[in-house]
């Protein structure tokens, strides 16, 4: 490649490792005439994690292709999305994001002087922008706005108006930043197509949209800021990185939903153009790969062991994180991190004495500790013909004993080694002399011919994976549900099986990171 890349070489750099491009022909035309103007925006909500290296590596590609790149710190969006960033923390979050993202870019050798950094509220509160928000609201339907934000904005039963404004503001950003293209994750696709539909209604042109794939988290599926064990924080200590990688989902030979392999593909290879598997001489010694697919093929063939893969990623990842940790090891940035993300347990000191006038506890699904389980053994209860006693692996050191009344409905052979859904924080109780340490959740149709089916996690799920209601991923479950408060009973009243056999709470899906919880056939059934 010469000093100035050709339009074809620029196109390759811009689009490599992307999952989808909308408007590729327009992109080609622009590259024939001039440099591409592009922006990447990030809402300043939770702490950035290592998956942010995916857009960082693409920003490096854009700069190599000669693009003019703007990074938007979308502080107003962070507030509009169900107040994921409280108003009083917006400035602090923006400062944290700016420092940590600049540190990430420096760690991969990206020259900061070639980038433009801008804060959303620097222009989104202007008279012109505000007028365009009103103009847009006069042509956009509620349906289209909600649909556009479905993969990005927190989904709740009664959405706030702020969340419905979010997609429109993101569309307007393309015009007000004067760019040709917007770059983001494939989870932004509906917002991108929303922008393509509605910007012309205001007399503005369609933009090109570039989408990178979502990197699976360490437990499978999308890496999430709200799922602690699925992500590695940029400031995690080396021992924490090793611990999380050790627990990562990485089955021998399995290349699907493999967050470890995906991180190598989308971050380490684009940055270094090679990856070294570090291993003992007894197992063949170190091996250098210069093409990702060669590594994937060897892993699929079990030539590369998961332990060696994880150890090698551990070394490579810590080389990226070391400069970031070093930068944040100053009193000023330590103080910033603490102020931008205050410890919730220290925000409100406990009042002395009983809190008689305190507000009632919120009854929400995140209070339930529901997990994927695998039935290890199943036997008839020694003293009850209608009960099974199961030993179920729910991701703990020892399997739990669970008693369930399924003898009349599910043959023993169908339960053995089956993946199930278990409620784990009910108070243990004895059932005919055997203590049950959880509840195996099932769909049921009541009546004379009662039918019962255990709920099914998505294929590929692992014992211990958290089950949550979409939109309620955050929050820690109660350590133990207090029987007198009837939290489970109140929530259970809105549990239902949909017409598509999906388990739901108030018409919102129960999920793991791999997809929705379902049952075999009991449409419209209850869940207990």
Swiss-Prot record:
Keywords: Acetylation, Aminoacyl-tRNA synthetase, ATP-binding, Cytoplasm, Ligase, Nucleotide-binding, Nucleus, Phosphoprotein, Protein biosynthesis, RNA-binding, tRNA-binding. The keyword Manganese does not apply. The modification N-acetylmethionine is found at residue 1. A motif ('HIGH' region) lies at residues 44-52. One of its GO terms (cellular component) is cytosol. Its main location: cytoplasm. The keyword tRNA processing does not apply. L-tyrosine binds at residues 39, 166, 170, 173, 188. A motif (Nuclear localization signal) lies at residues 242-247. Residues 339-363 are annotated as: Disordered. Residues 364-468 form the tRNA-binding domain. The modification Phosphoserine is found at residues 205, 386. A motif ('KMSKS' region) lies at residues 222-226. One of its GO terms (molecular function) is tRNA binding. It is an enzyme of class 6 (ligase). It is found in: Cytoplasm; Nucleus. The modification N6-acetyllysine is found at residues 197, 206, 474, 482, 490. GO terms for biological process: tyrosyl-tRNA aminoacylation. The modification N-acetylglycine is found at residue 2. Resveratrol strongly inhibits the tyrosine--tRNA ligase activity. InterPro entries: aa-tRNA-synth_Ic, NA-bd_OB-fold, Rossmann-like_a/b/a_fold, tRNA-bd_dom, Tyr-tRNA-ligase, Tyrosine-tRNA_ligase_regulator. Trans-resveratrol binds at residues 39, 170, 173. Homodimer. Interacts (when binding to resveratrol) with PARP1; interaction stimulates the poly-ADP-ribosyltransferase activity of PARP1. The nuclear localization signal, which mediates localization to the nucleus, is also important for interacting with tRNA(Tyr), suggesting that it is sterically blocked when tRNA(Tyr) is bound. Belongs to the class-I aminoacyl-tRNA synthetase family. This is Tyrosine--tRNA ligase, cytoplasmic. The gene is YARS1.
């Amino acid at each position: 490649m010469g000093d100035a890349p050709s339009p074809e070489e620029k196109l390759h750099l811009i689009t490599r490792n992307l999952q989808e491009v909308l408007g590729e022909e327009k992109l080609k035309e622009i590259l024939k005439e001039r440099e591409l103007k592009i922006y990447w925006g990030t809402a300043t909500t939770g702490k950035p994690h290592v998956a942010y290296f995916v857009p960082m590596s693409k920003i490096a590609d854009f700069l190599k292709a000669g693009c003019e790149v703007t990074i938007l710190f979308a502080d107003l969006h962070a507030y509009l999305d169900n107040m994921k960033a409280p108003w009083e923390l917006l400035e602090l979050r923006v400062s944290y994001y700016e420092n940590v993202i600049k540190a990430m870019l420096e760690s991969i050798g990206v020259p900061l002087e070639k980038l433009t950094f801008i804060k959303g509220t620097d222009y989104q509160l202007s008279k012109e922008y505000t007028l365009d928000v009103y103009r847009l609201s006069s042509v956009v339907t509620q349906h289209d706005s909600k649909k556009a934000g479905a993969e990005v904005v927190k989904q709740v039963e009664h959405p706030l108006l702020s969340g419905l404004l979010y997609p429109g503001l993101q569309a307007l950003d393309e015009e007000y930043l004067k760019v040709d293209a917007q770059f983001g994750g494939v989870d932004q696709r509906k917002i991108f197509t929303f922008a393509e539909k509605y910007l012309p209604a205001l007399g503005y042109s369609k933009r090109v949209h570039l989408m990178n794939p979502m990197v699976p988290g360490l437990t499978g599926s999308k890496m999430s800021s709200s799922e602690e064990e699925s992500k590695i924080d940029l400031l995690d200590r080396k021992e924490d990185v090793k611990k999380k990688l050790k627990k990562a989902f990485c089955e021998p030979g399995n290349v699907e939903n493999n967050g470890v392999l995906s991180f190598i593909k989308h971050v380490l290879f684009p940055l270094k153009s090679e990856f070294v598997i570090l291993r003992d001489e007894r197992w063949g010694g170190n091996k250098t790969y210069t093409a990702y697919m060669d590594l994937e093929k060897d892993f699929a063939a079990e030539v590369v062991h998961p332990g060696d893969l994880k150890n090698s990623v551990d070394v490579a990842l810590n080389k990226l994180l070391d400069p970031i940790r070093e930068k944040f090891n100053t009193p000023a940035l330590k103080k910033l991190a603490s102020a931008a993300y205050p410890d919730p347990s220290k925000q409100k000191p406990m009042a002395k004495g009983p809190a008689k006038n305190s507000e009632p506890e919120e009854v929400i699904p995140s209070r339930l500790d529901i997990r994927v389980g695998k039935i290890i053994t199943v036997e008839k209860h020694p003293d009850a013909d209608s009960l099974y006693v199961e030993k179920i692996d729910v991701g703990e050191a020892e399997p739990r004993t669970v008693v369930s009344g399924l003898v009349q409905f599910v043959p023993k052979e169908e339960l053995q080694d089956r993946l199930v859904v278990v409620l784990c924080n009910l108070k243990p109780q004895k059932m005919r002399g055997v203590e049950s340490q959880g509840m195996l959740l099932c769909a049921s149709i009541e009546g004379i011919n009662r039918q019962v089916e255990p709920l099914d996690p998505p294929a590929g799920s692992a014992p211990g994976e958290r089950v949550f209601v979409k939109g309620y991923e955050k929050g820690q479950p109660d350590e133990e549900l207090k029987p007198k408060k009837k939290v489970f009973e109140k929530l259970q009243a809105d549990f239902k099986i949909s017409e598509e056999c999906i388990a739901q709470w108030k018409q919102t899906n129960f999920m793991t990171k791999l997809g929705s919880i379902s049952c075999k056939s009991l449409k419209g059934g209850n869940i207990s």
